[in-house]
């Protein structure tokens, strides 16, 4: 995926001692996204706004807060996370590359 005429913040968002890294992208329409990579491990993220996570490469398992269901996602798939919630994401082998879109 390409973002034409977008603003990219050069300073990275670094989480979990560098195991999750992303960069903020603001499109010409004003949409805020992050483009990043998750190294193998298990991590929990909270949400303020609703989010859509698109998996670009690799795979992961996700458990949304308030559920016990584990969903598997791979390249070409996406999952939504409600606002004021969160999710636990597990990456097992290769890094998982993603685009996170902030909704609403």
Please give the residue ranges for each predicted region.
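A short, N-terminal "cap"/entry segment at the start of jelly-roll beta-barrel domains
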Residues: 1-31
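Short, conserved beta-strand element in jelly-roll/cupin
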Residues: 47-62
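Ligand-binding loop in jelly-roll beta-barrel domains
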Residues: 82-104
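Conserved short histidine dyad/triad with adjacent acidic residue
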Residues: 26-48, 80-83
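Short acidic-glycine-tyrosine-enriched beta hairpin
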Residues: 67-84
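A generic beta-sheet turn/junction motif
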Residues: 29, 66, 91-93
């Amino acid at each position: 995926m390409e973002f034409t005429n977008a603003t990219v913040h050069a300073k990275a968002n670094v989480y979990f001692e560098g195991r999750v890294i992303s960069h903020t992208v603001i499109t010409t329409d004003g949409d805020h996204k992050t483009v990043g990579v998750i190294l193998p491990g298990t991590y929990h993220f909270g949400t303020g706004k609703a989010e859509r996570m698109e998996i670009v490469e690799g795979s992961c398992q996700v458990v949304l807060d308030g559920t016990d269901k584990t969903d598997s996602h791979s390249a070409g798939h996406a999952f939504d996370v409600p606002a004021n919630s969160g999710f636990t994401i597990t990456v097992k082998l290769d890094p998982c590359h993603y685009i996170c879109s902030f909704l609403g």
